[in-house]
Amino acid sequence: MAKQDYYEILGVSKTAEEREIRKAYKRLAMKYHPDRNQGDKEAEAKFKEIKEAYEVLTDSQKRAAYDQYGHAAFEQGGMGGGGFGGGADFSDIFGDVFGDIFGGGRGRQRAARGADLRYNMELTLEEAVRGVTKEIRIPTLEECDVCHGSGAKPGTQPQTCPTCHGSGQVQMRQGFFAVQQTCPHCQGRGTLIKDPCNKCHGHGRVERSKTLSVKIPAGVDTGDRIRLAGEGEAGEHGAPAGDLYVQVQVKQHPIFEREGNNLYCEVPINFAMAALGGEIEVPTLDGRVKLKVPGETQTGKLFRMRGKGVKSVRGGAQGDLLCRVVVETPVGLNERQKQLLQELQESFGGPTGEHNSPRSKSFFDGVKKFFDDLTR
C-alpha cells in the first residue's frame, strides 16, 4: 500500500516552517500517543506515522531529499534500517512547553537553527515560461571557518557553565514552589566560551555575502516560491542552517498577459480585413504564426490557438494563446479614401447601416422606440 504524504499526515503545507511542523506534531502526538490509547492498534500505527513524518520534516537534509524524491529517498536502507522506530515519552513531546511551569523541562537548550532568508527575484515572462538559471548574491551569516561554529578560539573548548553545571537551567524557589528557568548566565546552552574566537568573537558565525546558482523551473508564475534547503543563515554553534526562499515576481510583458496557463494578446486589424477576412501574422512566445480571420469579424472576438500558452510548473496540459481582435478606425485619410468611404456608407443605407450593420440598426431602432414611448 502506498505510504501517505508526510505533509498530509501532519496536516501542514509543503512550505510550512519548522515551528508549524512542531506545533502540528505535538497536537497529533497527544491525541494518538499509546499511553492514552492503550490496546488501540490503529492509534499506535497512526502515532508511528506521525513520528516518522515529524523526524523527516524537522531534519533539513531529510526534508530536502523527501521534497525532491518522496518516499523513494529513504527506500532500500536509505534511512539506515528503521530510522523512525521507537516510541516517545510525553516529556519529550511537551517538556519544552511545560518545563518552565512545573520544573520538568528538558534541560539544556538546543542551539538555535539558522534563520530562513527570502530573496525576491524578478523574471521576464519568457524566463518564467521556459525556465532559467540565475546567479544571485545574498548577505547572510555563515559558519565561522576558524572555529567551525563553536565560537571558541582554536585549541580551546567551551567550558561548562558554573551556574547551571551544564544543565542549561536553574531552579528558583518561590514559597512552596520550585520553578526551573533558563540559566541567565549561559542563556540555556550549558556552556560558556572563556576564550572566544578572534574572528567571530564567540558567536560562531560571521557576516558574509555568498553567490548561489538558482535553477528556476519552467512554468513558474508570480507568487511561486522556490525553497533552497540549508542555504539560509548558519545555525548557532553548529546547529542546522535555515533555508532560502526565492520569491518569484514576473515582470509585465509589452504584448502578452498571463492568466493561469493561458496567454492573452490584442491583435489590431483594419476594418477592411474585418469585413472581408484574410490572413494575418500574430506573435507567440515561439515566433510568428498565421491566423485566418473570417469575414464579418467583429471587434473583441477571441481566437484560440491551442498549445501556444504555458505549461505549468505543476504539470498538466499546455495552455492556449487567446488573440483578441481590435478593429481599428482608419486615420489620416486622403480625399479619395474619404470619398470611397462616403460612397460605402451610402450603400449601407446611411449611418444606421440598415442593410449591412444589424447591430447598429437594432440600436437605433431601440433609441427611436424609447423616444416614441416618451412622447405618447
UniProtKB/Swiss-Prot annotation:
Factors inducing expression: By heat shock under the control of the HtpR regulatory protein.
What's a single GO BP term from this record?
A: viral process
List the keywords (alphabetical): Chaperone, Cytoplasm, DNA replication, Metal-binding, Repeat, Stress response, Zinc, Zinc-finger
Which consequence is recorded for altering D35N? Answer: Loss of ability to bind DnaK
Instruction: Please describe what happens when the gene is knocked out.
Output: Single dnaJ and double dnaK-dnaJ disruption are non-essential; synthetic lethality is seen in a triple tig-dnaK-dnaJ disruption, although this depends on temperature (triple disruptions grow slowly at 20 and 34 degrees Celsius but not at 43 degrees) and strain background.
Q: Where does the record place it? A: Cytoplasm
GO CC annotations, alphabetized: cytoplasm; cytosol; membrane; protein-containing complex
Q: Where are the zinc fingers (CR-type)?
A: 131-209
Q: How is the cofactor bound?
A: Binds 2 Zn(2+) ions per monomer.
Q: Which cofactor does it need?
A: Zn(2+)
Would I find Zinc-finger among this entry's keywords? yes
The entry's Zn(2+) 2-binding residues are C161, C164, C183, C186
The disulfides recorded in the entry are: none
| Known outcome of mutating K26A | Loss of activity
Residues that bind Zn(2+) 1, according to the entry?
C144, C147, C197, C200
Result of altering C186S: Loss of function
One GO MF annotation is:
ATP binding
Xref: Gene3D superfamilies:
DnaJ domain, Heat shock protein DnaJ, cysteine-rich domain, Urease metallochaperone UreE, N-terminal domain
Q: Where is the J domain?
A: 3-72
Per the record, what is the consequence of mutating C200S? Loss of DnaK-independent chaperone activity
Q: What is the effect of changing C161S?
A: Loss of function
Q: Where are the CXXCXGXG motif repeats?
A: 144-151, 161-168, 183-190, 197-204
Q: What is known of its domains?
A: The J domain is necessary and sufficient to stimulate DnaK ATPase activity. Zinc center 1 plays an important role in the autonomous, DnaK-independent chaperone activity of DnaJ. Zinc center 2 is essential for interaction with DnaK and for DnaJ activity.
Q: What does this protein do?
A: Interacts with DnaK and GrpE to disassemble a protein complex at the origins of replication of phage lambda and several plasmids. Participates actively in the response to hyperosmotic and heat shock by preventing the aggregation of stress-denatured proteins and by disaggregating proteins, also in an autonomous, DnaK-independent fashion. Unfolded proteins bind initially to DnaJ; upon interaction with the DnaJ-bound protein, DnaK hydrolyzes its bound ATP, resulting in the formation of a stable complex.
Per the record, the similarity remark reads:
Belongs to the DnaJ family.
Q: What is this protein called?
A: Chaperone protein DnaJ
Origin species, per record, is Escherichia coli (strain K12)
Its lineage opens with: Bacteria, Pseudomonadati, Pseudomonadota, Gammaproteobacteria, Enterobacterales
The encoding gene is dnaJ
